[in-house]
Amino acid sequence: MTEPPLPHESADDGRARLSYEDARDELIQIVQRLELGGLPLEEALRLWERGEELARVCQAWLDGARARLEAYRAPEQSAANDVSAPGSAEEHDHGR
């Protein structure tokens, strides 16, 4: 089974490949600039659009991280579910 590409590897529209931390840091700077106000409308819109793009990059990284963690946990959870706990219904049925 092959692993899905990392979010920064799937940029098929030519966007720069950013790490989660780089995207997050740039997004924070954009939010701070927008919160200060005083920007011309066109620049504010451009920054907002870039912020939306960066938020999507960050979300893709987080979704990928969650999927990787769940993939590692899945075999452990499956094995734990296969083991009958003491006092389970299965054990009670054998006592009849």
Swiss-Prot record:
Subcellular location per the Swiss-Prot or TrEMBL entry: Cytoplasm
Example GO BP: DNA catabolic process
E.C. number(s) listed in UniProt: 3.1.11.6
Catalytic activity: Exonucleolytic cleavage in either 5'- to 3'- or 3'- to 5'-direction to yield nucleoside 5'-phosphates
Disordered: annotated segments: 73-96
Entry GO MF terms: exodeoxyribonuclease VII activity
Predominant localisation class: cytoplasm
Keywords: Cytoplasm, Exonuclease, Hydrolase, Nuclease
The UniProt record lists the keyword Nuclease: yes
GO cellular component terms, semicolon-separated: cytosol; exodeoxyribonuclease VII complex
Pfam families named among the record's database cross-references: Exonuc_VII_S
Signal peptide from the UniProt entry: none
Disulfide bonds: none
Top EC class, one word: hydrolase
InterPro entries for this protein: Exonuc_VII_S, Exonuc_VII_ssu_sf
UniProt KW Ubl conjugation keyword: no
Subunit details: Heterooligomer composed of large and small subunits.
Purpose of the protein: Bidirectionally degrades single-stranded DNA into large acid-insoluble oligonucleotides, which are then degraded further into small acid-soluble oligonucleotides.
HAMAP family to which the protein is assigned, alphabetical: Exonuc_7_S (MF_00337)
Family statement drawn from the similarity comment of this UniProt entry: Belongs to the XseB family.
Protein's recorded name: Exodeoxyribonuclease 7 small subunit
